[in-house]
Amino acid sequence: MAAQQRDCGGAAQLAGPAAEADPLGRFTCPVCLEVYEKPVQVPCGHVFCSACLQECLKPKKPVCGVCRSALAPGVRAVELERQIESTETSCHGCRKKFFLSKIRSHVATCSKYQNYIMEGVKATIKDASLQPRNVPNRYTFPCPYCPEKNFDQEGLVEHCKLFHSTDTKSVVCPICASMPWGDPNYRSANFREHIQRRHRFSYDTFVDYDVDEEDMMNQVLQRSIIDQ
């Protein structure tokens, strides 16, 4: 049991910089960067969501996205799943405690959490307005595998699906890196799975940049609630 917990922690530490400061980081899948859903432990000891693992197993010679060892079907991580069901966390809005497995459904309807998100958006916009206007290109992106560039989000997803389906190299997501919250040094454990899950459509689908600040924040808030 202890060995399994250590392995789960090892996978989470590689899930991203936030995991180091987040005590719940050990419950984070290194592929989708979400709380494990139906966690499965593979032979090398690392853990993935069941759906993420199925995608990782699709290449002819699949490898673990964390340690790059040969990847094979694993076994259900029953103890980790039990911990997710029994570990408590607090809502950032109302401060009430919920089990980790229930927090998403709660924040979708918590008005105080919605206010918390709104204040965060306002603070981000205010801070950005004080910075020099050096806005990165967020409309076209280079392929992280080859010299091809000028893809929109959908085009990059399709390009990688067609021409890089067998590439296993860890690369930086150019879409995430261009965003204010993105880490330009973080290498995705499975980039193709990452963009297919996270960037299936453009951010322009969600935000109209021509509307005023208040309307834009409301749009972002509503979309974040829908996507919970």
UniProtKB/Swiss-Prot annotation:
Pathway: Protein modification; protein ubiquitination. A zinc finger (C2HC RNF-type) spans 91-110. Zn(2+) binds at residues 91, 94, 106, 110. It is an enzyme of class 2 (transferase). Pfam families: zf-Di19, zf-RING_UBOX, zf_C2HC_14. Autoubiquitinated. Polyubiquitinated in the presence of E2 enzymes UBE2D1, UBE2D2 and UBE2D3, but only monoubiquitinated in the presence of UBE2E1. The keyword Zinc-finger applies. CDD domains: RING-HC_RNF114. Keywords: Acetylation, Cytoplasm, Developmental protein, Differentiation, Metal-binding, Nucleus, Spermatogenesis, Transferase, Ubl conjugation, Ubl conjugation pathway, Zinc, Zinc-finger. The modification N6-acetyllysine is found at residues 102, 112. InterPro entries: Di19_Zn-bd, RNF114_RING-HC, RNF_E3_ubiq-protein_ligase, ZF_C2HC_RNF, Znf-RING_euk, Znf_RING, Znf_RING/FYVE/PHD, Znf_RING_CS. Its EC number is 2.3.2.27. A zinc finger (RING-type) spans 29-68. E3 ubiquitin-protein ligase that promotes the ubiquitination of various substrates. In turn, participates in the regulation of many biological processes including cell cycle, apoptosis, osteoclastogenesis as well as innate or adaptive immunity. Acts as negative regulator of NF-kappa-B-dependent transcription by promoting the ubiquitination and stabilization of the NF-kappa-B inhibitor TNFAIP3. May promote the ubiquitination of TRAF6 as well. Also acts as a negative regulator of T-cell activation. Interacts with XAF1, the interaction increases XAF1 stability and proapoptotic effects, and may regulate IFN signaling. This is E3 ubiquitin-protein ligase RNF114. It comes from Pan troglodytes. The gene is RNF114.
